[in-house]
Amino acid sequence: MKDLADHLFDILENSVKAAATEVKIILGIKDKLFFCKIEDDGSGIKDEDVTDPFVTSRKTRKVGLGLPLLKRAAESTGGSLQIYNSEKGGVILEFKIDIAHIDAKPFGDIARTFVDAIYSWPKVSFDIFIQKKNNKKLSIFNSKKIREIVSYSEMQQKEVRDFIYDSIDRELKKIKIDSQFGIF
């Protein structure tokens, strides 16, 4: 996976495969540390080490590389990856990456990743937050609320898709999440 956007899509896909209907994403940057927390209401994880590439619930192949690659990407910068079951059910995944580290991957187009997820899995509610420096969380997109306002056919229009993308991208750039790391 070439960038963090690829890793995010993989995590979101894991949530969907675990029958999640609601996925909450919190992103932020604090002291050159990018952090991401994803919570879902899916089926949870077994006690196995899901960061072992030879542990997978997949039936088609006996290898799962997504989480091991994310763990390596995080730890190679001095960051971390934690995955655990939520008390409410589902999974909580948190990772941190030192974006000032020479081995840090670029962000990639995270806004496009979210739009692709929203359109790929229309029955899943995605609630996206950014965490400000003062630790306040700001909701920047909620697919469930949008679907209450906009019809399915309207959602398919390019103008609506572009509006959703621009809205998410604008908010991510406010906390310096752009397709490249840039200079802080």
Question: Which functions belong to the PLM regions below?
Answer:
Residues 2-111, 128-136:
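Conserved beta-strand-loop-beta-strand hairpin that lines the nucleotide-binding pocket
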Residues 99-184:
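N-terminal assembly/transducer modules of large multi-domain enzymes
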